[in-house]
Amino acid sequence: MILIADSGSTKTEWREVSDGVAGKSYISTGINPFFVTGEGMIRLFGKELPELKGAGVSRIFFYGTGVSNASKADIVRAALSSFFGTDKLFIGSDLLGAARSL
């Protein structure tokens, strides 16, 4: 399963995709690496997305606010990798996500 996330500072929308078909969607608190630490992100995932831990997530595309440089992207990358157990990650800005959605 692939997860695609569109994150702002107040909420994150997550969507499962399997075999090219969009599946279930989830809403969690927003993730902005300027305001949330990596440990805070992992706690948030555990509290708000427990059903996705161990659910066979093979790849994640994360587009978010605050992902403005490599060090901020690395914070998000490490948290996602730790919680979901995959290293197949794309981390980009919310602006890139908006452009790709067109």
Specify the residue positions occupied by each region the protein language model found.
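Residue-level signature of transmembrane alpha-helix interfaces in integral membrane proteins
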Residues: A22, F45, R77-A79
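Short beta-strand-loop/turn "lid" adjacent to the catalytic site in phosphate-handling enzymes
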Residues: P50-F90, L102
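A generic local secondary-structure boundary/capping motif
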Residues: I4, S101-L102
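Short alpha-helix plus adjacent loop in nuclease-associated cores
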Residues: L96-R100
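Short glycine-rich, Thr/Ser-proximal phosphate-binding strand/loop in the N-terminal lobe
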Residues: I2-R43, G56
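General beta-strand structural signal in soluble alpha/beta enzymes
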Residues: A5, K88-D94
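Short amphipathic alpha-helix with an adjacent loop that forms part of the alpha/beta core around
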Residues: I42-L52
